């Protein structure tokens, strides 16, 4: 029995990155020998065991053979005669097909170290094409390591295009697509994930609402980058710099979906694209089974982001109604989230990356003012039932009006 550290832990250690999870491969052992050594079996489809002390995963070396469609259509073979090289060959990328033995020696049969040094994401073997989920995984790795200047090897991108064109991605379940997307959205450069999907044709298959934005022009005065798809990825990049929150990043990604519905004869203007985009956000989220809290914020951002940009000319009544509409009284975090997505929208434009966004500050300040109006005083004044809410709204509007006159005057007044 020989045990090797494999995959991501070896890769990240060689890159000088923190190692989070460790995966191990056991060569020359049977399931019974693992159980006798105190390991606990947890794998259902193939033998995976938990270490009795560390609870890290130890998998018996295995090979895989394509036996059906999609990413689940594989038959696994596990036996003591399966070599480490055979186990590593089934992995997706050469940089993930690395192992380290007890003495610290690196086993690298597929030149993963060379590709690490060259900053290349390259597939190990033609078997890559048998698993459509790998298209998304490579896009996610491209996003994860973009800050280290990694790129996808030409032959790997070509294979990803072939897989997409062959309809392989249609076998992916919504849950797996969303899981990879969720992980990609939390990387330092989530926009790279969607750019890679577009480069191989997968964006049109998996995210048609986003793909439809490419080639749709916006007024050059407000959008020097012109293309709405380009703007969308720029705003996502900016959102990633502004916030680590998945909610903020996903909502920013979806903020302009409505522009994909604008008839060509009305280009480059997109009046009413905010409310129009709400249905597309709903459609995308329903198809991929996106969590409800992410969906709800994305719908609000789609509908109201342009309103936030006009904050200086908003009436106090409109501002308080906005807080009602986003349910800020029960979910106050939404004020900050919407301020951030709106800022990402403005700064996600060519030449505007370093722009100040005072509207975000004013939105936050107005919220603090409105929130500070005491409900207790309204109740103690004798108001009852629906009168309490009506009086509270009046007092909030008055408080915001007083604040706005001092801190955020209407430029037209």
From Swiss-Prot:
Its cofactor is Mg(2+); Ni(2+). Its EC number is 2.7.7.72, 3.1.3.-, 3.1.4.-. One of its GO terms (biological process) is RNA repair. Residues 228-329 form the HD domain. Transmembrane segments: none annotated. Catalyzes the addition and repair of the essential 3'-terminal CCA sequence in tRNAs without using a nucleic acid template. Adds these three nucleotides in the order of C, C, and A to the tRNA nucleotide-73, using CTP and ATP as substrates and producing inorganic pyrophosphate. tRNA 3'-terminal CCA addition is required both for tRNA processing and repair. Also involved in tRNA surveillance by mediating tandem CCA addition to generate a CCACCA at the 3' terminus of unstable tRNAs. While stable tRNAs receive only 3'-terminal CCA, unstable tRNAs are marked with CCACCA and rapidly degraded. SUPFAM superfamilies: Nucleotidyltransferase (SSF81301), Poly A polymerase C-terminal region-like (SSF81891). CTP binds at residues 8, 11, 91, 137, 140. This is Multifunctional CCA protein.
